[in-house]
């Protein structure tokens, strides 16, 4: 599978950081595009785990029995804001379907119910988001900072976040698969 053209940037696609982004927040980042229109773009960085302890009014750890809850850094914008990315279609009036089986949204009651359900939905608690103004993302794409790949539920929830960047490049094949073998720290090469 080849890299998609920038005209294919849309809700439900991944932005995959190219090796040109060699440091910083988006280094080896994978961003799920949640909205893209003439006014700009919004997405969630889904492959950077956060080690946070959530306030008890949000999550009472004694009641956390859902094994499918994870915490992610959604991006560098408004990092004190939490968004729910999940697999539940039960609250459609509160959510936006990003791609088949992947939803954005929900309220505190949904979260509290989900964490106490051993068979509950997969949920990424995303702190912050990634955003671009009108035309900004297209310029970054044309400058060689991003590859595009269609997002699927299995990518979002079933592949380890620290392996997702490499996994997607390998799926793309060819020169992209070769790029996936570049070590994170080039001094180790």
Curated annotation (Swiss-Prot):
Pfam family, any one: DUF179
SUPFAM superfamilies, A to Z: VC0467-like
Gene3D superfamilies noted in UniProt: VC0467-like
GO cellular component, one term: cytosol
InterPro entries reported in the protein's UniProt record: AlgH-like
Coiled coil: none
Covalent S-S links between cysteines: none
Top-level taxon of the source organism: Bacteria
Membership in a protein family: Belongs to the UPF0301 (AlgH) family.
Name this protein carries in UniProt: UPF0301 protein pc1755
Organism of this sequence: Protochlamydia amoebophila (strain UWE25)
């Amino acid at each position: 599978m080849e890299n998609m053209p920038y005209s294919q940037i849309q809700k439900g696609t991944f932005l995959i950081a190219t090796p040109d982004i060699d440091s910083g927040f988006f280094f080896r980042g994978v961003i799920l595009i949640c909205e893209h229109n003439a006014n700009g773009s919004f997405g969630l960085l889904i492959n950077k785990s956060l080690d946070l302890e959530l306030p008890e009014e949000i999550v009472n750890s004694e009641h956390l029995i859902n094994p499918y809850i994870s915490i992610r850094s959604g991006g560098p914008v408004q990092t004190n804001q939490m968004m729910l990315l999940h697999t539940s279609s039960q609250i459609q009036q509160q959510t936006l379907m990003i791609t088949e089986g992947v939803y954005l949204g929900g309220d505190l009651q949904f979260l509290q119910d989900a964490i106490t359900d051993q068979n509950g939905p997969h949920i990424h608690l995303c702190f912050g988001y990634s955003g671009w103004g009108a035309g900004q993302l297209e310029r970054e794409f044309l400058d060689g900072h991003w590859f595009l790949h269609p997002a699927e539920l299995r990518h979002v929830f079933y592949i380890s976040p620290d392996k997702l960047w490499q996994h997607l490049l390998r799926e793309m094949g060819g020169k992209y698969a070769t790029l996936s073998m570049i070590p994170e720290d080039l001094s180790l090469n």
